[in-house]
Amino acid sequence: MTSYCEYLQDHPEDTLNKLYHDSEYGFPLTNDAALLERLTLEIAQAGLSWTLILKRKEAFHQAFEGFEVDSVAAYGEKDVARLLADSGIIRNRLKVNAVIENARRIQGLRGEYGSFKGWLGAHHPLSLEEWTRLFKRTFVFTGGEIVKEFLRSTGYLPDAHDPDCPVYKQIARLEPAWARDLRNTPPTERRDKASHPG
């Protein structure tokens, strides 16, 4: 299967995906609004192309008011109706409701973990299977593929970039969660951990 890095080497004209690959994909995120936004985009992509989601990324950001968790968690039926009428985003009621419910679930994590980022950090490292079970218990609309891509794209699982990709080295210098995990892993175990997240 072709990796994202290989795809972009073969398709240099795809500037939309290149921008995301070079400046966002795999980079660690540090605040709950950014994490909720990324989770939302992964949920929105289910059954659709990632390119379509990238084309609508800014519209999502505006429609959900920057993904400020408390604002989204407070959305009611009028907000749902507004979102379902917004042609700039993916107008799927299940997905829209999932964003709002997940914002409320993030609020619920604050008492014990302080934030969504704190919750992720408290459970890292886990295998992909363990992460998926945990997400399904904690959030809604979070199947295995959504969880995998969310964790890859936010620096909790490796393999967002090929090791020979220049962006891989750039991200590794930022010490995302997966890189800290590898640093603390005996060399004999690193190949499996790096090649097979989960």
What annotation goes with each model-predicted range?
Residues 1-198:
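HhH-family (HhH-GPD) DNA N-glycosylase catalytic core used in base-excision repair
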